[in-house]
Amino acid sequence: MRHGVSGRKLNVTSSHRAAMFRNMAVALIKHEQITTTLPKAKELRPVVEKLITLGKRGDLHARRQAFAQLRDDAVVTKLFSAVAERYKGRAGGYSRVLKAGVRYGDNADMAVIELVDRDVAAKGQDSGPKQNVAEEQEAA
């Protein structure tokens, strides 16, 4: 019996699930909107809500707890400055999940998870590795 067992397994191991939610949370805080499957989006929402609540607390212990989960200095800085400031007057409900049809390849239900009152300019910002490696080496 599954009494009191919460959360989906998503057909991956627990370490894979933890890493996946870490990466998805980093992407969501960085870009403020991501597209994923509906079950993953529904499971990601409480993870991100708790991180934003840590950001609103703003003390050193909260920052260390957020870094332990996210492991990305730039994203933790954004979380504790811009994102926390935006939601200081809101008591929860920082993200929303919108259904986005089905995926062409396997007919999986897709969803868009985004931060409420998001910064539209953040979408696509700093996504992926830099293409101009030669220019970077010349500068160094």
Curated annotation (Swiss-Prot):
GO terms for cellular component: cytosolic large ribosomal subunit. It comes from the Bacteria. Pfam families: Ribosomal_L17. Signal peptide: none annotated. One of its GO terms (molecular function) is structural constituent of ribosome. Part of the 50S ribosomal subunit. Contacts protein L32. PANTHER family: LARGE RIBOSOMAL SUBUNIT PROTEIN BL17M (PTHR14413:SF16), RIBOSOMAL PROTEIN L17 (PTHR14413). HAMAP family: Ribosomal_bL17. NCBIfam families: L17. This is Large ribosomal subunit protein bL17. It comes from Gluconobacter oxydans (strain 621H). The gene is rplQ.
